[in-house]
Amino acid sequence: MDSFEKEINTTFLKLNIPFVDYGITSSDSISLEGLFRNPEFPNLSQNRNQLFRMASMTKPLTAYLTLALLDDYRIDLHESVGTYLPEINNLKIAYKEGDTIKYKKNDVPISFHHLLSCTSGNAYEHHDPLVSELVSKKEVAPMKNGDDAFLKAPLVFTPGSHWSYGVSYGWLGKAIEAISGITLDENLKKYLCNPLGLKQTSFNP
């Protein structure tokens, strides 16, 4: 493994990554684990006890929680999310006609399947030029605000017709809370963290 570790450390250094805690595991063992510390960042806290933001790695967790909850509550995967979150029915579809952004009504109910598969019509501002333009014009709140305001961004296509990386998992989080009556973090602990003994894993409050 020495040559492999040397290779990945060289790669991390070329990419100017400050710190990496890495490992290779199977279902029952750890075959490799290591730490990469970039000497260009000597003041950065670099230890295995620090917490990391998981960013979009929270999506698989949210997907698992969604499927577990749908199973517990006997909710069909293709049922409309609007049954539990009426506000999602208010999202319109944005499109461009020349240089003008226009809107039309969405007549296709957004299902749990649409949200899970990123085919709901939701898009991130850094993935879709139309949403990016709306953010730049201050017609849509930017994601960096860190609140739910960006969920009000319009759809960019009819649900089920295309694929786009976007805020559909934000809507799933809200649906999980609406169905269960408890927070997303409480659901995470109930279905995943407690059964697996994960004591330092949580969603941000």
Predicted features by range, described:
Residues 129-144:
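Amphipathic alpha-helical interface segments
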Residues 33-35, 126-130, 204:
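Short, solvent-exposed loop/turn and secondary-structure capping segments
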Residues 142, 160-168, 180, 184:
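Short, contiguous, pocket-lining structural segments
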Residues 5-8, 28, 53-81, 172-177:
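Active-site SXXK
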Residues 46-49, 99-100, 153-159, 168-170:
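Flexible glycine/proline-enriched surface loops and loop-helix/loop-strand junctions
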